[in-house]
Design a protein with these regions (language model features):
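A domain-start/cap signature at the N-terminus of enzymes
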Residues: 1-64, 146-148, 153, 162, ...
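Serine-hydrolase catalytic machinery in alpha/beta-hydrolase-like enzymes
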Residues: 44-47, 54, 60-141
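Alpha/beta-hydrolase
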Residues: 66-68, 172, 215, 268
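Short beta-to-alpha linker loops that shape the active-site pocket of alpha/beta-hydrolase fold enzymes
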Residues: 97-101, 175, 271
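C-terminal catalytic histidine-bearing segment of alpha/beta-hydrolase fold enzymes
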Residues: 247-300
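The feature captures the conserved acid-bearing segment of alpha/beta-hydrolase catalytic domains
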Residues: 168, 173-259
Length: 300
């Protein structure tokens, strides 16, 4: 990744986010079910969809689950995989859409690495969360974050940048991982995180976030995840975490546990690179995090 893609708080991003904060989305009549893709006021190049369960009361604070799509941008399936979960828990689901190639340079992977050009994807997600609160008139506290494949790139790097915003995180089959490592530069390690993003890893806050890792035991393809010299995200040690997704996720588990984080690691028998199988395990994990649920009060 070019260093020019990682400069902290570019003028365009700061201006867009500042204007969004000054001009919140108007609160309209709250409806239940799925919304269309809603333009993000912080930066209309990006959008998000919500699932709102029925019978949310007044202006209460409710759980929020953010589900981040993979490389093919299946935002609807990312959202809908947690719809029944949301009904059970009285939770809202937010599924962002980070389109490929927003700068016209052929980069389809920018959101996975949190920044490209003037875009800070972590800040965009936080702007979407704030807009959703204003739009539907509900408050969210710390939220649950789930990501599969490309979305898992985003999820575990968001944990590094904003652990104080997370209630729990589920990381499913990422192609590459960033390890807590002060000796190696971003994105392989965290040495220059503070210079690039204005934040160093907050290990104390990270230890308060339960972490779920999930992958199929047949997720063994390597061609699409091997970094080669000259490729866009090549850097020294780019493949150091392992040859395939299973090995890389195991490296992430060991790294997080070595720094005191509580990690549940599911290896799913008979599954390859399978979103549905990983989402099922993620739902189980988040059920444990949120507790018994409130289905009688929130059933359709």
């Amino acid at each position: 990744m070019a260093k020019a893609d990682l400069e902290t708080g570019s003028p365009t991003t700061r201006q867009a986010l500042g204007e969004a904060a000054a001009r919140p989305a108007p609160t309209g009549p709250r409806r239940s079910g799925t919304t269309p893709l809603l333009s993000c006021r912080a930066d209309p190049r990006f959008s998000y969809s919500l699932f709102i369960p029925p019978r949310l009361r007044g202006t209460e604070r409710v759980p929020l689950l953010v589900s981040v799509h993979g490389s093919l941008r299946g935002v609807e399936s990312s959202r809908d995989a947690f719809a029944d979960f949301a009904r059970w828990h009285g939770a809202v689901v937010l599924a962002p859409l980070f389109p490929a190639d927003p700068l016209g340079d052929g980069n389809e992977d920018g959101y996975k690495y949190m920044a490209e050009g003037d875009i800070r994807y972590d800040r965009l997600l936080l702007a979407m969360v704030a807009e959703a609160e204003a739009r539907i008139g509900l408050g969210f506290d710390r939220f649950c974050l789930a990501g599969f494949s490309g979305g898992a790139h985003f999820a575990h790097r968001f944990l590094l940048l904003h652990p104080e915003r997370l209630r729990a995180v589920s990381i499913g089959a990422p192609g590459s991982v960033t390890l807590i490592d002060p000796k190696r530069g971003w994105w392989v390690g965290t040495r220059d995180m503070e210079r690039l993003f204005g934040r160093a890893p907050d290990l104390e806050a990270m230890r308060r976030v339960p972490v779920h890792l999930a992958i199929g035991d047949s997720d063994l393809e390597t061609a699409s995840i091997t970094h080669r010299p000259g490729s866009r995200h090549w850097m020294a040690d780019a493949n150091r975490a392992g040859a395939n997704r299973i090995a890389r996720l195991t490296s992430l588990r060991r790294n997080l546990q070595a720094h005191g984080l509580a990690v549940r690691h599911d290896i799913i028998p008979g599954a390859a690179h399978d979103f549905a199988a990983v989402a099922e395990r993620a739902r189980d994990f988040f059920h444990d995090v949120l507790g018994p649920g409130r289905a009688p009060a929130f059933s359709a």
